[in-house]
Amino acid sequence: EFRRVLFRSEDIEQIMAIFTTAKEYMAAHGNKTQWGDGYPGEEILKTDIDAGNSYVIVNNGMIVGTFSFIIGKEPTYQVIKNGKWTDDRLYGTIHRLASSGIVKGIARACFEYCIKQIDYIRIDTHKDNISMQTAIERFGFHKCGNIYVKGGAERIAYDYIS
């Protein structure tokens, strides 16, 4: 049984360890550039905590995953190339989804939680992040096109309407 809870400042060390594990996994599976240059760092996590947007996924009392979920407009989603969003209504955005690698089902647990909060969700991922693309598509997200994050890096954009 998974449960999702807002994470607190005292969880930062564990979350940073999960991000390190996720980066190592991505690098070992052909995605060496998605989370480079120290991203995501503690400052981003603290900002997410202060805004009430960061969550941990807990299994048997252990933090096994993390994600950020924000309802409202995502600045990098204002321009989409090679396609379009399914709808233009209010949506939630999932960012920084990562797993400790200890248990399976972290992405699904995140998606199921988020879709209960709002019926329209958007997410993006790196073209080399095949594991995340698979999880996103397996859940039923629709590939919409390409967006560009801060710094100009391209991401594949998806949305889901329940």
Question: How would you label these PLM feature ranges?
Answer:
Residues 1-6:
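Short, small-residue-biased leader/transition segments that mark boundaries at the very start
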Residues 23-44:
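Conserved GNAT-fold acetyl-CoA-binding loop/helix
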Residues 68-102:
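Conserved acyl-donor/pantetheine-binding loop and adjacent beta-alpha core of acyl/acetyltransferases
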Residues 99-116, 133-138:
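Conserved acetyl-CoA-binding loop-helix of GNAT-fold acetyltransferases
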Residues 108, 128-145, 153:
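Conserved active-site alpha-helix within GNAT-family acetyltransferase domains
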